[in-house]
Amino acid sequence: MTEQSSRTVQGRVVSNKMDKTITVAVERKVKSPIYGKFIKRTTKLHAHDETNQCNTGDVVTVRECRPMSKSKNWMLVDIVTKA
């Protein structure tokens, strides 16, 4: 049995209004099939923040984990920069 490394992404906290949960916006660039121009696309993820230490505007690293609720299957690894 080999252990797979969890997927980690970096994003910006856009909401921390829930208890022990943050919303993280992750930006990625996608190439337009028609024009060939790169377009920014954002994905919003719900992540588990056990100690409620994140604030809106923080840049954080989150990793994938087991489902903790219907929409929350990421957890906070560390805060890269504080807002």
Swiss-Prot record:
GO molecular function: rRNA binding; structural constituent of ribosome
SUPFAM superfamilies reported in the protein's UniProt record: Nucleic acid-binding proteins
Keyword Ribosomal protein recorded: yes
Family annotation (InterPro entries): NA-bd_OB-fold, Ribosomal_uS17, Ribosomal_uS17_bact/chlr
Swiss-Prot/TrEMBL GO biological process terms: translation
Cellular component terms (Gene Ontology): cytosolic small ribosomal subunit
Domain of life assignment: Bacteria
Keyword set, alphabetical order: Ribonucleoprotein, Ribosomal protein, RNA-binding, rRNA-binding
NCBIfam families: PRK05610.1, uS17_bact
Record family assignment: Belongs to the universal ribosomal protein uS17 family.
Assembly behavior: Part of the 30S ribosomal subunit.
Task of the protein: One of the primary rRNA binding proteins, it binds specifically to the 5'-end of 16S ribosomal RNA.
Protein name from the UniProt record: Small ribosomal subunit protein uS17
Source species: Pseudoalteromonas atlantica (strain T6c / ATCC BAA-1087)
Gene it is expressed from: rpsQ
